[in-house]
Design a protein with these regions (language model features):
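Helical cap/lid subdomain of alpha/beta-hydrolase-fold lipid enzymes
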Residues: 1-201
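Extracellular glycoprotein-like low-complexity segments
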Residues: 200-237
Length: 237
């Protein structure tokens, strides 16, 4: 998978003056993970990090190499499956919803308790990076994995278009977990089973949709309350 996607699943940044928080990561992997071997090294913590405490949920753990090998053994079998030419393989991916595509690890600036206002220290933190090429859970390249091998048909379900079709108060919120609630998906399955011609529209497509909208994403650290008001005093938050 990593060898087929254009964006790295993990990136790193450091401060102008070495923070000693991500410095070892940048030294070992550069600014991003670009290969499967680097990906494994990061998961195992080969840059030298130690396992965090139970309460430090914001820090990356070091995966068990034994369990990882078991997972690799499984994938060496299922990932190399090649369907017979008599079998029609179809992959349908949800598209248009903000989906986590990668994580950036960076040194977050924090104050130094009891050492004066000018003191600065750093804490390892991460921020998710989003893509619209997904259904809020699975990114399109993963949903279309079989096509990497050149033996599967690809289709897209524009969930953003589907969810915004109705009036504001009646809009839907279909995503990965309930993609089969989309009428076009059910009609598509029916047509495949009956060997009928496939019908495409603004929701079900045989080419990848193009995102032409500006998107606003806001990230904050808890505890915090977000509120928004319009000119009529309507409130959400």
């Amino acid at each position: 998978y990593i060898n087929h996607v254009s964006a790295s699943p993990i990136t790193f940044t450091d401060s102008g003056i070495s923070s000693n928080v991500t410095t070892a990561m940048v030294s070992r992997y550069g600014s991003s993970i670009n290969s499967y071997s680097e990906y494994k090294d990061f998961l195992f913590g080969f840059e030298g990090r130690t396992n965090p405490g139970i309460s430090q949920t914001y820090l990356p753990i070091n995966l068990s190499q034994g369990l990882f090998r078991e997972a690799e053994d499984l994938h060496s079998v299922i990932d190399n499956f090649i369907p017979p030419s008599s079998l029609r393989v179809i992959e349908v991916a949800g598209w248009g919803l903000d989906t986590i595509a990668s994580f950036e690890y960076y040194p977050r600036t924090v104050g130094c308790s009891g050492q004066g206002a000018g003191c600065i220290s750093y804490l390892l933190d991460q921020r998710p990076r989003f893509t619209v090429d997904g259904d809020k859970t699975v990114v399109v390249p993963s949903a279309h994995y079989m096509n990497f091998r050149g033996n599967a048909e690809r289709y897209w379900v524009n969930l953003e278009e589907h969810n915004n079709e109705l009036f504001v108060d009646l809009r839907r919120n279909r995503e990965h977990k309930d993609i089969f609630e989309v009428n076009q998906v059910n009609s598509f399955i029916t047509s495949v089973i009956k060997k009928e011609d496939l019908v495409f529209d603004t929701v079900l497509k045989d080419t990848m949709p193009v995102d032409t909208k500006n998107r606003f994403r806001l990230s904050v650290h808890s505890p915090v309350t977000l509120s928004a008001y319009d000119i009529n005093g309507n409130h959400t938050g």
